[in-house]
Amino acid sequence: MGQIEGGFVQGLGWLTTEQISWNVNGNLSTYSPSTYKIPVSKDIPEKFNVDIYEKGLNIEKTVNRSKAVGEPPLMLALSTFMALKNAVNNNNLKSPATPENILMALQE
């Protein structure tokens, strides 16, 4: 379960908080967690339901036959971004959907 939750939260950060910027020399300014905002525990949804399909075809003897489940949930975070896009009623909302980008989308 932790792999699935972690993948989703990683995607949540990618699409809502992790703003990338470069300095005047073209060097990346946001190169580590100390220079950009990553999700923290309070950013994780309070209610987070995960179900594993028990009748899958994976034969690996892992917990709940859950081999390779860490990466796909990253893309599930698109649901959050799309919900924000829908909430501001603007298809031009830029990613990451930071408060600044949301405000700009609302003002268009």
Residue ranges and their predicted role:
Residues 1-108:
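C-terminal catalytic domains of large/alpha subunits in multi-subunit enzymes
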